[in-house]
């Protein structure tokens, strides 16, 4: 039986991306799992773009910030950072990779994610890749492996599938060869043009094969260890149905995808409590308000631009169109200007006093 301190929870930031997501993750993790090791990995090329407020928060919560060497994927494959992070050395006996858009839902025994001789995973929600199932035959043939007879139930569609797992939560023994085999398998598949549409799903395609090739078996965990909160908010009746299902699940590891999906679930109050304990913000909504405002403005600008682009415009409409076009260009430029993006953040987010 492992102690909480025998586990390392690790994740990736990619400035300016995933910074506020990581605030939610480390706040909820430290709130519920006070003795676990927390490690944030950042590409070394982005070292100078880790903002001071985040370094300060990490220090206050005993989060170890480490830097990743360049990945071997060409062209760049951002999901490859998780595999590269998995390959790094960590002292605790068990490593658990978490996508950064995750919150810890409650205190629980991490041994539930650490079955000896296994890699802990949760099935993907839907057929993001692998439909038709015959696509897997070519992948397994690359490694002279038979397609397994085993089937898993996809967590959202409830359809049966050849083992296909969400790579947002992966638990494995730190001293095993699994991570290196994951990298080797992913690189091999990435270089095979016969495997169509392999990106961005490469990490998940390689995952079940890497488990087997490393001499491990998959510990197929229940959905509560990677509970997706995403839903179609434009269809309230369907969203309400999904929330009922989410609320009925014992969500220990909450894969919220976007903070807006936290709202309206039974997990919101607890996540907000963790955030308010370690930061000056009362919850996820306040923490991410500026991001939401920028997203709302962009949506409005794009709507105006698209509605006027192809029509015969009046003088007044032409003024609106030119203003929207200019603002659209400014928004697009700001998205790729890392320095400008980081300047929006406060100097500190720690609680005052």
Annotate the PLM regions.
Residues 1-353:
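Glycosyltransferase catalytic domains, chiefly GT-A lineage
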């Amino acid at each position: 039986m492992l102690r909480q301190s025998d586990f390392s929870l690790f994740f990736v930031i990619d400035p300016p991306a995933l910074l506020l997501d990581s605030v939610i993750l480390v706040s909820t993790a430290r709130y519920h799992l006070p003795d676990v090791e927390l490690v944030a990995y950042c590409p070394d090329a982005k070292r100078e773009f880790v903002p001071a407020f985040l370094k300060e928060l990490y220090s206050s919560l005993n989060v170890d910030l480490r830097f990743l060497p360049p990945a071997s994927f060409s062209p760049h494959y951002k999901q490859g950072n998780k595999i590269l992070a998995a390959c790094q050395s960590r002292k605790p006996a068990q490593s658990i990779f978490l996508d950064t858009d995750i919150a810890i839902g409650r205190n629980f025994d991490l041994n539930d994610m650490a079955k000896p001789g296994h890699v802990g995973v949760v099935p993907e929600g839907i057929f993001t890749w692998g439909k038709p199932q015959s696509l897997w035959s070519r992948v397994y043939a690359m490694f002279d492996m038979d397609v397994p007879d085993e089937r898993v139930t996809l967590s959202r569609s409830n359809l049966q599938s050849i083992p296909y797992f969400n790579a947002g939560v992966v638990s494995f023994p730190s001293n095993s060869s699994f991570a290196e085999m994951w990298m080797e398998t992913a690189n091999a598949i990435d270089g095979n043009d016969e495997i169509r549409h392999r990106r961005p799903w490469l990490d998940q395609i390689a995952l079940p094969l890497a488990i087997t090739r490393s001499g491990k078996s998959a510990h197929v965990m229940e959905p509560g260890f990677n509970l997706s909160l995403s839903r179609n908010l434009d269809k309230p009746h369907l969203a309400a149905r999904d929330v009922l299902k989410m609320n009925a699940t014992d969500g220990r590891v909450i894969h919220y995808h976007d903070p807006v999906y936290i709202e309206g679930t039974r997990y919101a109050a607890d996540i907000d409590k963790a955030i308010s304990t370690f930061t000056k913000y009362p919850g996820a909504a306040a923490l991410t308000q500026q991001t939401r405002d920028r997203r709302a403005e962009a949506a409005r600008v794009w709507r105006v631009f698209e509605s006027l682009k192809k029509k015969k415009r009046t003088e007044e409409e032409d003024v609106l169109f030119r203003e929207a076009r200019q603002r659209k260009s400014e928004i697009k430029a700001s998205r790729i200007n890392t320095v400008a993006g980081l300047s929006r953040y406060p100097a500190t987010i720690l609680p005052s006093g």
